[in-house]
Amino acid sequence: MSETVERHEFGAEVGRLLDLVVHALYSDREIFLRELVANAADATDRRRFEALTNEALALPSDARVLIAPDKAARTLTISDAGIGMSKEDLAQNLGTIARSGTRAFSQALGERAAEGGEDQRPSLIGQFGVGFYSAFMVADRVTVTSRRAGSEEAWTWASDGKGSYTLEPASREQPGTDIVLHMKEDADEYLESYRLDHVVRKWADNIAVPIAIRDAEGKEEAANRGTALWRKPKSEITEEQYKEFYRTVSHGFDEPWATLHWRAEGALEFTGLLFVPSMKPFMPMEDDRRSKVRLHVRRMFITDEAELLPNWLRFVHGVVDTDDLPLNVSREMLQSTPTLQKIRRAVTTRVINELSSRSKNAEKAEEYQKFFENFGPVLKEGIYEDFERRGEIAPLLRFRSSTEGGWTSLPEYVARMKPEQEAIYYLVADDVEALKNSAQLEGFRARGVEVLLLSDHVDAFWPEQLGKFEDKPLRSVTQGSADLAKLKPEGETAEAAPALDTLVAALKLALEPDVSDVRTTDRLVDSAVVLATSGMGPDLQMQRLLRRAGRGFGGSAPILEINPRHALIRSLNERAEAGEDLKAEAGTLLDLARVQDGDTPRDPVAFARAVAAALAGTAAKPAESA
């Protein structure tokens, strides 16, 4: 055996990519430990697999991944008892990028399976050989000493990551690998046992291979639980274990409202363990719209940014683990491979099916209503954002109603519609109580027509996107003159409305350009006026939201509708026919309609004065008649 140290240049691809890997590819420095632990776990898994056909390669009983910081020497060592590497392996796997031994082994294993050989497949993750180089984010020099299982020779690979590496003979008592990182000055935190423990529990808690951390006194502490709960059969998992795992992944204190645990098999294989919380999070869900489902590949946590569920299901927490996903160059920058897209679709379908099943369970209707109170506003976002899924989401929604005391659904609403009723009517405002007392509902109540009351922040957006449900159009009661002509008022026959042509003309003239039209309406009973839109654009609530956001609204002004049977309107009509100037009264009517709809008067001071004057006139009448 030659004692000469061999110096080699990195492969051309390494020279080009090493700087990228170290400085740009990884967005979080702590990922270096995930990569090195993953490699060590892979090596251990590979030796266990090869020992199935070669007993001489059997793992020692205490096989583990050991992480040992040394503050005095400023080194961090990651050791394993895995398959190890020969001199050729070190040169091939660490001297070139994207050619790891694990990837070559997976290819060889696939060839063996195609030939009808062993069908057992170890969980191997390092399909791209860039993870090792992340060590140079925290180390200015790395040495790797390894002995291949079944061989007596050991070799040391060393590099400062600047274009070359050395190989020299070494000694190692048992097969396996030691990676020694000579830490940079700004990486002291990774010489602290508590920091290492935190990183391991975050990124590798469910790796099957035991992981231990050795402290300064030489004491070893287990750093991972080593069992991927989602990989166990449901029959072997207790309810308490599910709850504990849910609290771990959600950082919550409640119990899961729903637990989904399944194994997808066939052309696409993955395991899912998902939870729907029973409580809303303390922080508003609008602040963080990312999916809360973690992606694992062969038990190893890859990322929580794979968007495995759409934003409108972001209240769901959990894990999806697959053996079939081809990893891209870096795990935290995993791109949308076709396999991942299929997994997303399958996981989303599973969650929707679960919610659909629970929404139809009449015996547990109150439980579903509680869920909807917690997460309904988020679910509604799916109508606006997900064209493909709108038809599946709509039946899951629940609403307050002008006629029902509790919650109702779109299917239930349609089942109660009057035979001559053409549309599903809804009204949007900021507050449910304001909705219940809205003048917009008077004509509908008089005819026994149900109106859905919408008060969530997203309710101004999604109804127009849904458009219709079961071939019934959704129509805001503020959008144009709702067609109530076919619906007779219940009870007494409606009094014939007087002609108000003179008043209508006077109001139009006085209110231009603040209104686009003035017209009489049969949808008011107790109120004198109400606002409407033309029906060709956003409803009134959407227009208000646009104004609050400073975006304005380029459409037409609202329509002022007046109640021809109201005493105030009749009185104003008489004054209009007598030729009086009604400009001030017209402005007060418009502001009154705005206030009724939860908006502000155009000029609050002028409106207050008008109201005060009207009250003063009312108070003076008894004195005048005395």
From Swiss-Prot:
* UniProt entry keywords in alphabetical sequence: ATP-binding, Chaperone, Cytoplasm, Nucleotide-binding, Stress response
**Sequence segments annotated as region (A):** 1-331
Q: Does the keyword rRNA-binding apply?
A: no
Q: Which InterPro entries match?
A: HATPase_C_sf, Heat_shock_protein_90_CS, HSP90_C, Hsp90_fam, Hsp90_N, Ribosomal_Su5_D2-typ_SF
Q: Is 4Fe-4S one of the keywords?
A: no
GO cellular component assignments: cytoplasm
Where does it reside? Cytoplasm
Query: Segment C: which positions?
Result: 545-626
Map out region (B) in residue numbers.
332-544
What molecular functions are annotated in GO for this chain?
Answer: ATP binding; ATP hydrolysis activity; ATP-dependent protein folding chaperone; unfolded protein binding
Listed under subunit, the entry gives: Homodimer.
Q: Give the protein's function.
A: Molecular chaperone. Has ATPase activity.
Q: Mind telling me which NCBIfam families this protein's record contains?
A: PRK05218.1
The similarity annotation says: Belongs to the heat shock protein 90 family.
Give the protein's recorded name. Chaperone protein HtpG
* Species of the source: Methylorubrum extorquens (strain PA1)
Gene (UniProt): htpG
